[in-house]
A protein has these predicted regions:
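HotDog/MaoC-like acyl-thioester-processing domains
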Residues: 1-14, 91-139
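Mid-chain, well-packed structural core segment of small domains
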Residues: 69-99
Length: 139
């Protein structure tokens, strides 16, 4: 876990990590969210409507933005305050995702960092883009 403090941050600072999406994560997220839409739970249905298989829950994929902020950029001293997300392409179980974030703006008055983030999968295909606002609670 990174421990960037406010005074350590600068525009252009980047962090990244990789994660693979597992069936176990899908099952757990489905139980927690209560979302039983067959697009996410029934691969045959998903194929019939034009996908390669069951589509990973968008908010499961988006949860990796929380990991980015809480563990990597800024890490320990961060509190996610807002996020705007665009889903660009579907994610499937077994995909390996690269989550990248870069600080694009710092507000001294609010001690808030704005992070431009994206998630891509193998081959570099972007699956999600986000703008994240993060409070930093340590000087």
């Amino acid at each position: 876990m990174n421990e960037y403090r406010w005074n350590d941050l600068r525009t252009g600072l980047q962090e990244e990590f990789k994660v693979s999406v597992t069936q176990e994560a899908m099952d757990t997220f489905g139980k927690l969210s209560g979302d039983s839409n067959p697009l996410h739970t029934d691969p045959a249905f998903a194929v019939r409507v034009g996908f390669e298989g069951a589509v990973v829950f968008g908010l499961l994929t988006s949860s990796f933005y929380s990991r980015l902020v809480g563990l990597y950029l800024p890490g320990k001293h961060a509190l996610l305050q807002g996020i705007d997300i665009d889903f660009v392409s579907p994610v499937y179980v077994g995909d390996t995702l690269l989550v990248v974030g870069e600080i694009i703006f710092l507000s001294e008055a609010y001690r808030q960092a704005e992070i431009r983030a994206r998630i891509s999968k193998q081959g570099g295909l972007v699956v999600s883009k986000a703008t994240i606002r993060v409070g930093v609670h340590a000087a």
